[in-house]
């Protein structure tokens, strides 16, 4: 379990670190990107000005909605976020920047908050993530990619294709940006388990993601 979690956390960071470093270069000063940064201060979806597809509202299936309805609300008070988790999921760690839970069979909810500069170009960054994910879809690394609005926050949702080894991790992830308490934040929500266990959680994972509620 520890090795799987460690690998998941490492991959979680590597998924966006390189791209985010490039995007930070775009943030420069306020004047350099005033035409692309969002003025939205409550974390709701910014207007679509970057050419990214219009986000669809999160729509759980009947089975996924049943998972949500039967789940236990788990709050991250430091960040004003909450999710509905299936029975038996337990807290591993909760800090101001990360929020991690696990299931009895080693599935994980791993959430990370990154605080960015006030002038960080959220819209441009989100479009870049979407474009990168679409390229990964074409390359066969991802099984599906879409823009999804979860409780008023627009993000890129993607599901990894089955790994080469059934013991390697497979992830269902959603990356978004928001303004919260005066901060510009990247919100990275990942559900993960080993490849052989992924099918068992094929409804749990989207249900967890779509159950998110955010204080506005």
Q: What residue spans do the PLM features occupy?
A:
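Sec-dependent signal peptide recognition
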Residues: 1-7
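N-terminal targeting sequences that direct proteins away from the cytosol to non-cytosolic compartments
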Residues: 5, 16-108, 168-169, 184, ...
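Hydrophobic h-region of N-terminal signal peptides that target proteins for export
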Residues: 10-16
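A short acidic-to-branched-hydrophobic micro-motif
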Residues: 101-128
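Second-shell loop/turn segments in exported
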Residues: 112-120, 145, 193-198
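Signature of long, low-cysteine stretches enriched in small and polar/charged residues
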Residues: 131-181
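Glycine-rich phosphate/pyrophosphate-binding loop shared by adenosine-nucleotide-utilizing enzymes
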Residues: 187
């Amino acid at each position: 379990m520890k090795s799987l979690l460690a690998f998941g956390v490492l991959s979680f960071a590597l998924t966006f670190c390189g791209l985010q470093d490039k995007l930070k270069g775009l943030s420069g000063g306020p004047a350099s990107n005033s035409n692309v940064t969002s003025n939205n201060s409550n974390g709701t979806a910014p207007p679509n000005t970057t050419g990214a597809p219009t986000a669809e509202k999160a729509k759980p299936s009947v089975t996924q909605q049943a998972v949500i309805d039967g789940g236990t609300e788990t709050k991250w008070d430091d960040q004003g976020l909450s999710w509905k988790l299936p029975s038996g999921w337990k807290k591993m760690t909760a800090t101001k920047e990360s929020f991690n839970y696990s299931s009895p069979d080693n599935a994980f909810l791993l959430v990370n908050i990154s605080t960015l500069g006030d002038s960080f170009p959220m819209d441009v960054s989100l479009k870049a993530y979407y474009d990168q994910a679409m390229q990964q879809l074409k390359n066969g690394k991802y099984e599906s990619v879409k823009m999804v609005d979860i409780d008023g926050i627009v993000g890129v949702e993607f599901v990894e294709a089955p790994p080469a080894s059934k013991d390697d991790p497979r992830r269902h992830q959603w990356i978004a940006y928001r303004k919260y308490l005066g901060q510009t934040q990247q919100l990275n929500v990942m559900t993960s388990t080993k490849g052989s266990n992924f099918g068992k959680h094929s409804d749990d994972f989207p249900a967890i993601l779509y159950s998110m509620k955010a204080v506005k």
